[in-house]
Every structure is written in C-alpha cells, then in structure tokens.
A protein has these predicted regions:
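Glycine-rich beta-strand-centered segment in the early N-terminal region that forms part
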Residues: 28-45, 55-98
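Glycine/charged-rich beta-loop-alpha catalytic/anionic-binding loops adjacent to active sites
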Residues: 113-123, 152-154
Length: 209
C-alpha cells in the first residue's frame, strides 16, 4: 500500500464561504523522479495568485486541485538524477503551477528552483519570501534594468504599496543592492512598517495615502 499524506485542496471553484471551497483530504504521497526533491513541508505562505487560481471558474471537476506556491521544509528523499540537495537539507522555494501546490505534507519540486533555507530564518519566515522576492527582483533588475552593483546609486525610486509583500522586499533590494534613495507609499495603518523599511542615512520618506 502506498503511503498517504494530508493536503488542502478543492474540486470545485466555490465562494470561499462555502464549506467545500477548501477541503482537508488524504491523498497518495508523491514519489520523486528525475531531479525531484520530496520535501516535508514545514511552512507555507498564501499569495494573491492562490485566491485567483481558486476562483478560476465555476465548472465542477473530478480532479483535486492543491493550491500553494511558497514553501519551506526538509528534504526527505531525492530523485535518481538529483545532485544539489540530499535528505535532511533545509530548503525553501516557490513551486511550479504545472504541479500540485505546496498545501500538503509532502511536496515534489525540481531541485533547480530550490534554495537552501537561510540559517537565520525560521521555516515560517523563509516560506514568506520566495514568490514576493522573485517578483520584486524580476521587476527591478530584469524589467527595469536597475544595476545590482550600485551603478545607479543615489537615484530615486518610487515604490507604491511599500508595506505589502512585494513592496517591502522591493524597498530592501533597492537599498541594499541598488543603493537607491527610496520613496514609498503606504496606507496609514501600514505606515510604521513602511518607514522602518525605508529608514537609512539618505533623506528618504514614506508618503501616506
């Protein structure tokens, strides 16, 4: 008999108030192949894309959908071609939308999109980083072409929604790697967090909207 695991998923795209919009289920545990890592999930985070995918339509389905991108956990087993990690390694990552999500006890992920969990972060803290950090990184350094070596040091960068997940990471990347002067906006309840991210030797500010 194959081992099983607990997961959270849905069969139908129902309003979140519906009792079957998200279900606790017992499913077969996955088996690693190729360069897969089988990760015992210790923490996950929820992103806006999770709500969008769960609300993708009204059609009933017979296939279980497991949500979740971000995860942090411990490698339990590896596929035969895996070479970057070994059982016992602590890792974090944003998974793939081509595979079941991370809202489960055991999750398969290609080792090439996985990183070692920072030793100074808890599993919960590490799980909060991947998707927001990737989004902020790609926006600044790949789309906008901001230098990671400080070639644009001292220039001003406006970040809207500076207290949010992506915004708070974007501020820190802009300051640490880009050495930019950051101007960020935030709603009044979030202004304290935003100010803590923008504070530095520069005369930076956080506008309150």
């Amino acid at each position: 008999m194959r081992p099983t695991m607990k997961a959270v998923g849905h069969y139908q795209y129902l309003p979140i108030e519906h009792p079957e919009s998200l279900l606790d289920v017992q499913v077969d545990a996955p088996q690693p192949e190729g360069r897969d890592l089988l990760v015992e999930v210790k923490a996950i985070s929820v992103n806006p894309v999770d709500t969008k995918r769960r609300a993708a339509g009204n059609r009933p389905d017979t296939e279980l959908k497991i949500l979740g991108w971000d995860a942090a956990g411990i490698v339990q087993a590896t596929g035969p071609e895996a070479e970057l990690f070994k059982p016992g390694d602590k890792v974090y990552y944003a998974g793939s939308n081509q595979r079941p999500g991370t809202n489960c006890q055991l999750h398969l992920v290609d080792e090439r999109i996985v990183g070692p969990k920072p030793a100074n972060l808890s599993f919960a803290e590490a799980a909060a980083l991947p998707l927001t950090t990737l989004t902020a990184w790609e926006a600044q350094f790949e789309r906008m072409g901001i230098s990671k070596s400080g070639a644009h040091a001292g220039r001003r960068l406006l970040i809207l929604g500076g207290a949010g997940g992506v915004g708070s990471i974007a501020i820190q990347l802009a300051k640490k790697l880009g050495r930019l002067a950051v101007i960020a906006s935030a709603s009044r309840p979030d202004s304290i967090a935003c100010r803590s991210h923008t504070r530095s030797a520069w005369s930076e500010m956080c506008s309150i909207s």
